[in-house]
Amino acid sequence: HTEFEQIKDYVVGDDFRRINWRATARTSHLMTNVYQDERSQQVVCVIDKGRVMQQAFRGMTYLDYAINASLVLSYIAMRKEDKAGIMTFSDRFEDFVPPSARRGHMQQILETLYRQQTQFAESDFSALTAHVNQHLSKRSLVVLYTNFANKVSMERQLPYLIQLNRRHRLLVVFFVDNELKEYIATRPDTDEEYYRHVIAEQFAYEQRLVVSTLKNHGILALLTTPENLSVDVINKYLEIKSQT
């Protein structure tokens, strides 16, 4: 059930059938009717299940952390009257739970995510992009959980990320390696420790470079630790929502 709420300027992507011809004639530019349910945003968690998500921290893989964060974000989004959806992919597109806020939807998300496991294959971002564009006609906030160890691994996927961001608001979420953080935090005493320290610093620099490169292309990026993932993702969602 949708109730009429207001008339606004037509923008590309609005439903042509909703054009208000009387208001258009009066203002001499296209106007369209807005209904209450259109104010809700679509929030779609896209989870990479490829081998980059197999890394473990405290007995859980990065995939496990991404699943937990997706569940929390979906719940919060629906409480905020947004529609939550889920996609998973690895070397092929796998699951899709269309965005919704209906009763029982959270259970469907839970059941879909409960059975997920990482794959040994390299993830296919090309297939993901094609399916996102096919399944999501409405501009959505797409929260992509993946992992980029360095700028080179990200740049291979950058054309697809740019394409996704053109149609949607893309937030790329990836992980700080906690062991690297510990290496950087400790003062090296031996040559071997110094060598490890230098490598850890280089990895950390590469990840910061990934964030700045994505931002330079207008793509939101969140680099976080596994244990802070859910809180950081929720805060980022609320920040984005306050700006729309």
What function would you assign to each model-found segment?
Residues 59-62, 116-120, 143-152, 160, ...:
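Short, contiguous acidic/charged loop-to-helix segments that flank catalytic cores in large enzymes
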Residues 3, 70, 125-128, 153-157, ...:
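Amphipathic coiled-coil/heptad-repeat helices and related helical stalk/stem segments
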Residues 59, 63, 99, 122, ...:
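Conserved phosphate/pyrophosphate-binding and hydrolysis machinery centered on Walker-type P-loop NTPases
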Residues 97-123:
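Short, charged loop segments at secondary-structure junctions
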Residues 1-104, 139-144, 159-163, 210:
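An amphipathic, basic-hydrophobic helix/alpha-beta surface used to engage anionic
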